[in-house]
């Protein structure tokens, strides 16, 4: 097998998978957000399309890895916030509640077009978030590139009540899930 390419501009994903010596090529895929109820197909299709968009850019046979993360509250998908107000609204909506963080990973062989996809779900419960705490977080960390308006690795004390599941999954990609999916190509 040739090289492996991460079709992502996420520094968090690149860091989690750094031991794999992946080439990084940000996916040119443009996400079309349609506010729908959550389904695994939704996030898995985004991961697949991100990887697929890199295939024409590659000449030698390679494994292309795409990923997408969504935050889900009930059936509502909380994507990346549009602006400050949207980020504030999302974080206040998550206050005192348990939500799911779902990351889908797709791996495509650029030559054969064989692909495998899986999803990992983790759960996060937030404490009661004051307006001041939320405003301070948004002003300091500018979470506008993060699903659900937060990065768990940068949340200050006072945010998290409980985490269930794979922390890497919440950050952006589970190395365990990636390794398991990669086995299908060996």
What are these regions (language model features)?
Residues 1-63, 75-77, 129-132, 179, ...:
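N-terminal polybasic phosphate/anion-binding patch
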Residues 3-15, 121-186:
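GST superfamily/GST-like fold recognition
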Residues 16, 20-29, 106-113, 143-157:
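Mobile beta-alpha loop/short-helix "lid" or hinge segments that flank ligand
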Residues 17, 47, 68, 87, ...:
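Residue-level signal for inorganic ion chemistry
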Residues 42, 69-99, 126:
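Active-site-adjacent loop/tail segments of enzyme domains
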Residues 63-69:
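Ordered, amphipathic secondary-structure segments that act as subunit-interaction surfaces
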Residues 72, 106-108, 160-162:
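Short beta-strand-to-turn element immediately C-terminal to the catalytic PLP-Schiff-base lysine
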Residues 91-140:
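Conserved core of the sugar-phosphate nucleotidyltransferase
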